[in-house]
Amino acid sequence: MKKYLALALIAPLLISCSTTKKGDTYNEAWVKDTNGFDILMGQFAHNIENFWGFKEVVIAGPKDYVKYTDQYQTRSHINFDDGTITIETIAGTEPAAHLRRAIIKTLLMGDDPSSVDLYSDVDDITISKEPFLYGQVVDNTGQPIRWEGRASNFADYLLKNRLKSRSNGLRIIYSVTINMVPNHLDKRAHKYLGMVRQASRKYGVDESLILAIMQTESSFNPYAVSRSDALGLMQVVQHTAGKDVFRSQGKSGTPSRSFLFDPASNIDTGTAYLAMLNNVYLGGIDNPTSRRYAVITAYNGGAGSVLRVFSNDKIQAANIINTMTPGDVYQTLTTRHPSAESRRYLYKVNTAQKSYRRR
């Protein structure tokens, strides 16, 4: 279980789509918004720590949906990488009732991230006729869960057969863990194939690359957020990639949070940025495979940092890359890029893209 402590939430600002600012420039409004977000995160983590203890601070991330309710006493945590759903409560009275409500709401919640505030304890989760987790979870009889009656029966089964407890030194934590189906990742990916194909045709970006980026960034979690306030399936930051894309489309300002939490808008914006990296920022790289490696790395760490691996002069950097084989470019970016995260990112996305190309 990932634990994000308050101090860890105040991260340095980089230059990328999923974690940083693009174009190597900063603006005052963006800095103010980022500082405000850091303050919000620090206060939110402090509130959690007051109830759960220092070692039990768990906050939503790119691949982790975490929602607190009951005045921070109950939380639902979906780990989209591991495929587990953990419902926990520290309620001192009727903990089973608190767990039951949270189990039912989590199983039946919709797929509209803009309607849910993951940074508060407000109970704003609504039951949907088309649950987001439908098909990704089955009950004790092996059936998918769409209706409240089946969710209620499954909750009762879980509380009777899988209820666990532990102490955090302050309170007793009661919990239930649900395993998602083995192919939960594919189930989620399938939801967005139509949107991916539309964006692929619109911007000329390979479907397999879009899917690989989505898997690596969010594990197809539409509720994805990050400590740098990257949002949605492709982890787009409003004031960086979002602003660049809007400018290229003749729009002023930056995309709103609700816009980027909309799956179709997020995929469109993220794909548009991939096209900008490929055609504009890194368009001087001739070999398409070498350019793809550079684009993938730049989506995480910024185009400027990619080129500086080869030369501080951008034109000279492209010229150097054009003298290298794609294999040498890959080797250089995965071993010499200054960011360990970006080095790993290229490996992860490239590996994921190969798997989607085989399908």
From Swiss-Prot:
One GO BP annotation of this record: cell wall macromolecule catabolic process
Broadest EC class assigned to this enzyme: lyase
UniProt-listed Pfam families: Mltc_N, SLT
Domain of life where this protein originates: Bacteria
Chief subcellular location: membrane
Lipidation (S-diacylglycerol cysteine): 17
This protein's UniProt keywords: Cell outer membrane, Cell wall biogenesis/degradation, Lipoprotein, Lyase, Membrane, Palmitate, Signal
Recorded GO MF terms: hydrolase activity, acting on glycosyl bonds; peptidoglycan lytic transglycosylase activity
Subcellular location: Cell outer membrane
Name the record gives this protein: Membrane-bound lytic murein transglycosylase C
